[in-house]
A protein has these predicted regions:
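Chalcogenol-based redox active-site neighborhoods
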Residues: 1-171
């Protein structure tokens, strides 16, 4: 359980509201409240409705001093392609919050939302070891992180269950 604990730090690349690609870390939001939400994959059935719902209510989050970050195990290029796909064709259009890439699944793993992954320890020719993760996606997890970087609220939904944006706003 992560509630009341310091939110795991991350640094990754993200597609920003203006469609630029930038490095983003949780520490960039120090002193701000953050909703960090995970979704399974780009170009899937339920996910666009949730991402669009966050975007539609973004001004309400901002009026409460809350930044919104979305994250999946997809690449920044997949996020960008999804943003550049019309909503009527299964895309998400130009959502106005950052979409974080998590190709190595380290962010999803650190927030304990990764499901269906298989880990393997791989040793290089130089004898150095590394843990790799194959397969797996993020469950629908939502985290409210306070100004000090502490997780104050967490909700985790199984893959077929959508999340309630009103509940995140209520928190």
């Amino acid at each position: 359980m992560l509630v009341t604990k310091k939110a795991p730090e991350f640094k990754t690349q993200a597609v920003m509201p203006d469609n630029s690609i930038q490095d983003v870390s949780l520490s960039d939001y120090s002193g701000k409240k953050v909703v960090l939400f995970f979704y399974p994959l780009d170009f899937t059935f339920v996910c666009p409705t949730e991402l669009l719902a966050f975007d539609k209510r973004l001004d309400e989050f901002k009026s409460r001093g809350v930044e919104v970050l979305g994250c999946s195990v997809d690449s920044r290029w997949s996020h960008l392609a999804w943003k550049n796909t019309d909503v009527n064709n299964g895309g998400i259009g130009n959502v106005q919050y950052p979409l974080l890439q998590d190709l190595d699944k380290s962010i999803a793993r650190s927030y304990d939302v990764l499901v269906g992954a298989k880990e393997a320890y791989v040793e290089t020719e130089e004898g150095e070891g590394n843990t790799t993760v194959g397969g797996g996606v993020a469950l629908r997890g939502s985290f409210l992180i306070d100004e000090e970087g502490v997780i104050r609220h967490a909700v985790l939904n199984d893959l077929p269950l959508g999340r309630n944006i009103d509940e995140m706003l209520r928190m």
